[in-house]
Amino acid sequence: MANPGALGSITYESEATFGVDTTTFATLRVPIVAPVDCSGLVHNKIDSERVMQYRNDGSTWILGTMGGSFKTKLDLAGHGSTTSGAVTLTGTETLLGYVIGNVAASASAGTTFTGGTATAPTTTASGTFSAGSIGFAGAINDARGGGQAFAVSTHATTTLNLLTALGGLPTNGDVCYSAVNIYPSEAPTSTTVTSLRFLLQTANLSYECHGCFPTAFSLMGLNPGERPQIEVTWAVAWWRYSTATFPSTVATETYNPSMIAGGSLFVNDAGTATRAARTFRNFQIDYTLGMEILKGPGGVNAYQDIVGCRRTPDKIKVTWTEDADAATTSPVLPGFGTATTSKHMLYTSATAAGARFGIYMPKVCIDSVAVQKVDQNLNRLTCSGMAYTGTTTTNDLTLSAFRMGWA
């Protein structure tokens, strides 16, 4: 008898080797926000094309290889708790690290500001924030950090040198929040992928999916007033039915996101830390994940031809819309397009501690010259650019073309 399709569970674990036949899925019950859809799984059948003697005769079809895909849709919910103190990675952050490439805390714990300047505030802690990482400063409407994200150049003893200045000089005791950074690898040899196995459960059938890896993801709901989410597409090397107990008892996370409100968009010439916040109406990031499927022998299942995958270059495009300038011969956004200087950008989703995130892109090359258009009955300009590898070669984090900090 058919049961409600709204009921389901997806649990996972990382694999020791690609596609290994192991049946534990206890790392996390993924906090999905859309029903479990198994319809993308396939076990191919191939026409035998045998020559027959009668006009409409035929023969049994050949059983082919397994594969297919499924999707997981999650909220971009931030860290789930304050990062003013000690920081431990959550299960969702760890999962998204597998998707994009890496995950690491900016600092093992947050700290407090003691003074300094907007571009080089001083902190109680010494040398704890990683170069290239994201943090958050103060609270909304404090006229200083404002609860907004910042990007770190270096943390030299107690001086926190910033790539993106704060809104004002911090006051002694203002909170300096750590964050969890999710970012891609940039080294030319960093192409390996940790495969995962998932258990897709419904109130009827359940499926074990082995040799799983991300092939795409979409960032959604980044405009003011929207609910930020991410949807990941997972390829599957082989699968089988499961009779594992449902409902699952694997632990999950139920953190609610902040709506996109109270945040900011910093855009300035790359290398210039002076705060330059743009008043945006729409914001979008199109992240095309570079992933190549490897087919070959040696699979652990008789119907498995996918035996691995490798990362290839990603494509990261950022687009945002602003109101048109007053009459002028030098409007700002079109000037971004005609200039030859690359930008760096920092997006803050919201200001609520534990439910926000920031996105920093150290090198954005504008790919169009904005021309005025009518958008929602108002004159507006849309600017877009491609995010590329940063110029600071300290480590993968400083190089990363895209980094998301959850706090």
Locate the predicted segments by residue.
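Signature of extracytoplasmic/envelope-associated structural regions
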Residues: M1-A407
